[in-house]
């Protein structure tokens, strides 16, 4: 089974560097590739990708689109079209994975399920130190991880550690609280729902819509807690409000029990 890791990014090359550095050093990952879903970043990001392409042990592909505002759904669809994996892991370009991230996702992969991961939020100070290479994040050093937590650099710590006994199928039909920064789906299921709905522009709810349509298609949710946690570098987050065009679009998907979107991997005329 070949895996494609789709990394979303927009004009934050220093954070992307930290993410790619970890993806470059994955252990027991099997066959995989990285595809950058770039929502219109400038030349600095292009240089980061080109520099990594020279030293990366697996294919590293750059899927770039023109900057026309926040178009995460479209950039992910572009990356998916260029990918060749049987199984796709979606990761944000400000989330540092552990060295066994791909390996653990591979072990969780199961036909008929998509996997949702979790994240640990990093403090602004610690994120800045990582960005400026003042310190480094050793994701395999348990002592240092606990120390970072007690120094208030992490918002939580227990979820960082692997628990093979965690019940993973309790909320099989629950689409809420999906973290778009860390989830995985089979390629055949991605195409079954026609990918991400590019009708979502601006911040929010495109991930929820994707999860709802997967569930409507009969794909169930599997929790990646205590297995594929990522470290989320600090940035100010916009809060999604349950109002506006994107929220209304999600409600329509729920009401109509929609499966395939019209404006996705394949564009359907109205």
Per-range role (PLM):
Residues 17, 43-51, 100:
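Acidic helix N-cap motif at the loop->helix transition within catalytic regions
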Residues 22, 38-49, 95:
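A conserved acidic beta->alpha catalytic loop
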Residues 88:
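Short aromatic/hydrophobic "clamp" motif used to bind/position activated sugar donors
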Residues 12-25:
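Short, well-formed alpha-helical segments that are part of the catalytic scaffolds
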Residues 66-83, 100:
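Glycine-rich, basic loop-to-helix element that forms the pyrophosphate-binding segment
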Residues 31-41, 61-65:
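Short beta-strand/loop segment that forms part of the nucleotide-sugar
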Residues 100-148:
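Conserved donor NDP-sugar-binding/catalytic core segment of glycosyltransferases
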Residues 2-4, 33, 209:
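Cell-envelope/extracellular polymer assembly enzymes that use nucleotide-activated donors
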């Amino acid at each position: 089974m070949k895996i494609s890791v789709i990394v979303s990014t927009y004009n934050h090359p220093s954070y992307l560097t930290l993410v790619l550095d970890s993806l470059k050093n994955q252990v027991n990952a099997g066959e995989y590739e990285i595809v950058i879903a770039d929502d219109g970043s400038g030349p600095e990001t292009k240089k980061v990708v080109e520099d990594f392409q020279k030293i990366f042990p697996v294919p590293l592909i750059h899927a770039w689109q023109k900057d026309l505002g926040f178009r995460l759904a479209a950039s992910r669809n572009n990356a998916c079209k260029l990918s060749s994996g049987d199984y796709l892991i979606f990761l944000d370009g400000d989330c540092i994975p552990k060295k066994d991230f791909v390996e653990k996702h591979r072990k969780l992969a199961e036909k008929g399920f998509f996997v949702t991961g979790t994240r640990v939020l990093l403090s602004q100070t610690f994120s800045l130190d990582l960005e400026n290479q003042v310190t480094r994040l050793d994701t395999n050093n348990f002592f240092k991880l606990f120390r970072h937590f007690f120094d208030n650099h992490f918002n939580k710590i227990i979820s960082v550690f692997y628990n093979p006994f965690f019940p993973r199928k309790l909320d099989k039909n629950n689409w809420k609280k999906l973290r778009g920064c860390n989830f995985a789906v089979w390629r055949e299921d991605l195409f079954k729902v026609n990918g991400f709905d590019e009708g979502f522009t601006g911040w929010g709810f495109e991930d929820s819509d994707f999860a709802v349509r997967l569930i409507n298609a009969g794909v169930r949710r599997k929790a990646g807690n205590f297995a594929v946690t990522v470290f989320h570098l600090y940035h100010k987050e916009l809060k999604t409000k349950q109002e506006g065009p994107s929220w209304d679009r999600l409600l329509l998907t729920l009401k109509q029990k929609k499966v395939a979107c019209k404006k996705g991997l394949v564009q359907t005329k109205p």
